[in-house]
Amino acid sequence: MALAKHKKASLWGAFFVVCSLLGCGPAQGEDPVALPATCSMPAQAQPVRSRSVTDGDTLRLSDGRRLRLIGINTPEIGRDGAPSEPYAQAARRALQALVEHQPLQLALGEDGRDHYGRTLGYLFDEQGRSIEALLLSQGLGYAVVIPPNDLLAECHQAAEQLARSARRGLWQNPPVLSLDELDSGGFHLLQGRVAAVTSSRHALWIDLD
């Protein structure tokens, strides 16, 4: 992301920011796990097992596939001497507790693979509960939407709202940055005023002052 007086972000990246800050989605107090209309397991889900957990949103399946969970972005674990982001290790431990030595169900996303070659999917436990929603409801990640993988977007937003309302996890003190504080790319929560919205062939862009 280029750094200038006007910062640009893709429409969906900006949508993540706006919804995280303004609370888009279901009203406060709704339990995402208890909402079958938004968090129910798709019929095409298939049984899988976890081999190992990389971080809060990525794991290795027993069949060798690397799985990136859809709809959640967890804090980054530090590498090459860099420190881990707050709650990164907590998110990893929580995912381990949910998936290790447990029968799981996997529903692939409409777009089933990312540019790193990882499988993209929705993961469910033996009771049919969304693993992503469970992590989000604990405040261990941010709900994100990247079309066309938006099947459980309402579920994930409801789960995040549950954590926000209770100020759980990273929502105890969310790291919201001003534009002047932004010094790197990647996922960030930003605050600013929308100056303009423009479009390109594959994306819309929001300029922030």
Which residues does each predicted region cover?
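Small beta-barrel nucleic-acid-binding modules, primarily SNase/OB-fold domains
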Residues: 2-3, 22-209
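Positively charged N-terminal leader segments that act as targeting/secretion signals
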Residues: 4-17
